[in-house]
Amino acid sequence: MESSEPLVLDVGNLKRGEIIINMGPQHPSTHGVLRLEILTDGEIVKDVIPHMGYLHRCYEKHAEKLPYNQVIPFVDRMDYLAAMNSEHAYAMGVERMLGIENDIPKRVEYIRVLVAELNRISSHFVAIGTYGLDIGAFTPFLWVMRDREHINRLLEWVSGARMLYNYIWVGGLFYDLPVGFEERCKDFISYLKPKLAELQKVIIDNKIFIERTANIGVLPLDLAINYGITGPMLRASGLKFDLRKVDAYSVYPEIDFDIPVGTGAVGTTGDCWDRTHVRVAECFESVKIIEQCLEKLLGEHKRTREFDPQAIVPKKIRPKVMDFYVRAENPKGELGFFFRTTGNTDIPFRCKVRAPSFVNLSVLQAISKNVMIADLVAILGSFDIVMGEIDR
């Protein structure tokens, strides 16, 4: 039986000129409390091993102690930059176990998709802005944080919180949209469109940015599939795989949008530039989705006095005995929840999470050998990991 001890570099077998150094767990470029153990020969990375666990908060154990609806605040705290998306996936999974998925009102579903796509743009803005900081571009970070603040205010207006929302419940929503929200959101989208075009021009098409990211950290498609990579990282390697299309959950089948993929336009398919390009392109697609949701929420599924966002929320949650897996497309990739239920309680026997950041980080060692230390920072930043989700 193989040892469960973590991988460590062997100090006793160092060759001449090789040094083992630590990056983190307090280093700003590691995007959280992640420690990278790096074997270097001068400025060249010969090997790298990520060490995690510094932010472990026992999410899965908490989920075994609390009723299903009371777990949602803990779901928020995994990928805290995309809490709406995480809530959507979790609530959808419990609804499918209960067999009430088709009973959810259309207005509720469109609101869920609307706030999830706003949160997707917000998450991608953090990824793009902090990535600029990683490779020496400070000003774009200020730009995306300025525009992300508008999204934070919209979501705060909806839920009362700026980041950890507890808004999407099993069977419905905490509240309906505030009066005037749809119009204010339309104004924001009108403001955002030229800002996204500016972001594309100033960052993605920037010559210095291209020199810093093109042909760096190339992730071949076969390697991405073998490691189970999902989300923008997989699509940047050239595969059109998006669970919003593949699984067609919620009202996404009724919405028209495209799946951006990496093409190696300025370098090699699957490099750091492609990963950032895909995230910016996905912001444009999220804008299209939001516009279509607003059209439905102001038209066919407009607000009525009789509408109750909690009408389908079950008073007691008693799923049958089953093993059940649900997945959804988070900004980082495939977020999955595996439930094992016993049938006589409103608390799951087991709730296992498939965290996309955790899986995506696993490929770092494979694509970072024989690169410069400065390029290792660029590679890690292009992964867009969140340590709250990795450590859970």
From Swiss-Prot:
Keywords: Cell inner membrane, Cell membrane, Membrane, NAD, Quinone, Translocase, Transport. GO terms for cellular component: plasma membrane. Its EC number is 7.1.1.-. Its main location: membrane. It holds the Pfam family Complex1_49kDa. SUPFAM superfamilies: HydB/Nqo4-like. It is an enzyme of class 7 (translocase). It catalyses: a quinone + NADH + 5 H(+)(in) = a quinol + NAD(+) + 4 H(+)(out). It comes from the Bacteria. It is found in: Cell inner membrane. GO terms for molecular function: NAD binding; NADH:ubiquinone reductase (non-electrogenic) activity; quinone binding. It is a peripheral membrane protein. Belongs to the complex I 49 kDa subunit family. NDH-1 shuttles electrons from NADH, via FMN and iron-sulfur (Fe-S) centers, to quinones in the respiratory chain. The immediate electron acceptor for the enzyme in this species is believed to be a menaquinone. Couples the redox reaction to proton translocation (for every two electrons transferred, four hydrogen ions are translocated across the cytoplasmic membrane), and thus conserves the redox energy in a proton gradient. NDH-1 is composed of 14 different subunits. Subunits NuoB, C, D, E, F, and G constitute the peripheral sector of the complex. This is NADH-quinone oxidoreductase subunit D 1. It comes from Cytophaga hutchinsonii (strain ATCC 33406 / DSM 1761 / CIP 103989 / NBRC 15051 / NCIMB 9469 / D465). The lineage of its organism: Bacteria, Pseudomonadati, Bacteroidota, Cytophagia, Cytophagales.
